[in-house]
């Protein structure tokens, strides 16, 4: 092969490689699209984005959209927001929606809301079209002891000025639930709540529950009211059961004390019987001593034995008569 021809082929291959690298590194088509949309961007600006590891279409496409919407947004603002980790496309969409709805919203404010983790586009849309938050059934107990369950629908509008640092929907639901419980608990009778559920919404709405939140409460409507358990009767039943258990425990304690006292008295009876037996055992000794010392004679002793025998005989007769009478009664 001719050396000149080989050199020419090498130059052509090198040119093709350089063009491929150029079109890969430099988004020429994106640059042409921006120029066609009337957005003036230097090709070196796009190259600088590549060097700063910024995806050019993530910045240029929102810039074209903002330019077509008539927004005064610089490419440096969009690039800095992208580098900060924000969603450039969502911020531009929020600015366009705010402009169409005549809501004052600057790029700096919108970017701050986006970096705070809030969906700024949803917030703008919610400012135009309020959102309805439905609470679960919230139970409260009226003064007559009847449980009343209420479900509320809260219509809120986003407050863009308080999106950064303001509380969310959970706080709104918790505060409304607290107001419902307080209103039901202050009612003398559960029938008043059933007859006039607007009393709950009016009382709750007058407390300014949206302070410190990212929302403005427009209305609170009671969607459903239901009757729950008779808490007062349940508490009284539980108290009566507890009183019964206490009384049973005290009665058992008294019974145990009575049994213990009975056992103690039986022990004392046995002790007295032992003393009687001991005393009876000393009688023969005393009799023998009296006979030995001559204090009583033999005839006196025999008379005493006869008297004892007569006494035992009368006792046996009495027992026989008593047993016979009991059998006759049976």
From Swiss-Prot:
Keywords: Cell membrane, Membrane, Transmembrane, Transmembrane helix
A Pfam cross-reference name: FloA
Keyword Transmembrane: yes
Keyword Transcription: no
InterPro entries referenced in this protein's UniProt entry, alphabetically: FloA
Gene Ontology cellular-component terms listed: membrane raft; plasma membrane
Record's bilayer topology term: Multi-pass membrane protein
Transmembrane segments: 6-26, 28-48
Subcellular localization: Cell membrane; Membrane raft
Quaternary organization: Homooligomerizes.
Task performed by this protein: Found in functional membrane microdomains (FMM) that may be equivalent to eukaryotic membrane rafts. FMMs are highly dynamic and increase in number as cells age. Flotillins are thought to be important factors in membrane fluidity.
Family label: Belongs to the flotillin-like FloA family.
Name assigned to this protein: Flotillin-like protein FloA
């Amino acid at each position: 092969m001719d050396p000149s021809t080989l050199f020419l082929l090498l130059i052509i291959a090198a040119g093709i490689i350089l063009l491929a690298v150029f079109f890969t590194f430099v988004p020429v088509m994106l640059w042409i699209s921006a120029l066609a949309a009337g957005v003036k961007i230097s090709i070196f600006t796009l190259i600088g984005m590549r060097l700063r590891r910024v995806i050019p279409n993530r910045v240029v496409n929102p810039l074209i959209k903002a330019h077509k919407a008539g927004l005064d947004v610089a490419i440096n603002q969009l690039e800095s927001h992208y580098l900060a980790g924000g969603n450039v496309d969502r911020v531009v969409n929020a600015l366009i929606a705010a402009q169409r709805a005549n809501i004052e919203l600057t790029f700096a404010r919108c970017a701050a809301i986006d970096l705070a983790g809030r969906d700024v586009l949803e917030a703008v849309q919610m400012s135009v079209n309020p959102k309805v938050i439905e609470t679960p059934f919230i139970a409260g107990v009226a003064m007559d002891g009847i449980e009343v369950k209420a479900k509320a629908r809260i219509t809120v509008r986003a407050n863009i000025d308080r999106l950064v640092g303001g509380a969310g929907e959970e706080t709104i639901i918790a505060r409304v639930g607290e107001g419902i419980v307080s209103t039901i608990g202050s009612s003398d009778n559960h029938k008043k709540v059933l007859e006039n559920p607007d009393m709950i919404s009016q009382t709750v709405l007058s407390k300014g529950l949206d302070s410190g939140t990212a929302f403005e409460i427009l209305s609170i409507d009671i969607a459903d009211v239901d009757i729950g358990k008779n808490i007062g009767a349940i508490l009284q039943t539980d108290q009566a059961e507890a009183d019964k258990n206490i009384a049973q425990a005290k009665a058992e304690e008294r019974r145990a004390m009575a049994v213990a006292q009975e056992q103690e008295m039986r022990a004392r009876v046995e002790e007295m019987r032992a003393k009687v037996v001991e005393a009876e055992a000393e009688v023969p000794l005393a009799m023998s001593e009296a006979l030995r010392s001559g204090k009583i004679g033999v005839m006196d002793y025999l008379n005493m034995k006869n008297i004892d025998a007569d006494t035992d005989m009368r006792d046996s007769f009495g027992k026989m008569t008593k047993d016979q009478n009991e059998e006759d009664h049976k």
